[in-house]
């Protein structure tokens, strides 16, 4: 009987967050759809083979590939939150619950805190992913290694009097490699690693007793991944910067939405002087 009542309370608790779950699911679907099924519009793409900004060498083996980026960002950030809430509870600040929304009866403070933390993190990841994917398609900027990806047809170039060409001169048979060359801005690696490591750093500083030195690995890891994208000729410097800016904006909005500082409600009004 008690277990049935507990299950009902948890169901009612999760219903309070249906809207957030829907956003996470919808944004994840939109991101996957944009990555798998959509490509940037190539009709208006024009480029010069003499442009040094897109004439870097194509590097097949990236320092940090897509899978490694997902593990370092999504996997590592969730693991830090889960591990701290489950096994390092002594590091959690006593007043952490005051920053959360009101907890229904029958739901423990520990569970409420862990659920809210992971919920905020997943909102950040999914919204950031959807926005990044959409912006890549809309902007359609060329990567630094685009010419090498394109493999220009020398015969078509010699038959043309123009110094500016379109995608029709590309001999690249692997369309995935070619179309990925049109999705430079913003950097997905940058937005993913900054959004997750930014949250992880902020979460540890706000809700745990870990000092700055113990959390400095978060921004350092993000910086390493960002620099690797420039070294691999996958992005221009402004691509990784724009990805980081987008990530910070998403962190700010989701943090404000999820965590509500209720401490001010507990402050008594100032006494009225007569």
Curated annotation (Swiss-Prot):
This protein's UniProt keywords: Golgi apparatus, Hydrolase, Membrane, Transmembrane, Transmembrane helix
GO CC annotations, alphabetized: Golgi membrane; membrane
Parts of the chain on the Cytoplasmic side: 34-69, 140-189, 232-237
Alphabetical list of Pfam families matching this protein: PAP2
Listed GO biological process terms: phospholipid dephosphorylation; phospholipid metabolic process
Transmembrane segments: 16-33, 70-87, 118-139, 190-203, 215-231, 238-255
Lumenal side: 1-15, 88-117, 204-214, 256-274
Region described as Phosphatase sequence motif III: 228-239
SMART domains per UniProt: acidPPc (SM00014)
Entry text on domains: The phosphatase sequence motif I (including Arg-143) and II (including His-189) are part of the cytoplasmic loop 2 and phosphatase sequence motif III (including His-235) is part of the cytoplasmic loop 3.
Additional note from the record: Present with 300 molecules/cell in log phase SD medium.
Record-given protein name: Lipid phosphate phosphatase 1
Organism in which the protein naturally occurs: Saccharomyces cerevisiae (strain ATCC 204508 / S288c) (Baker's yeast)
Upper taxonomic lineage: Eukaryota, Fungi, Dikarya, Ascomycota, Saccharomycotina
Gene name of the encoded protein: LPP1
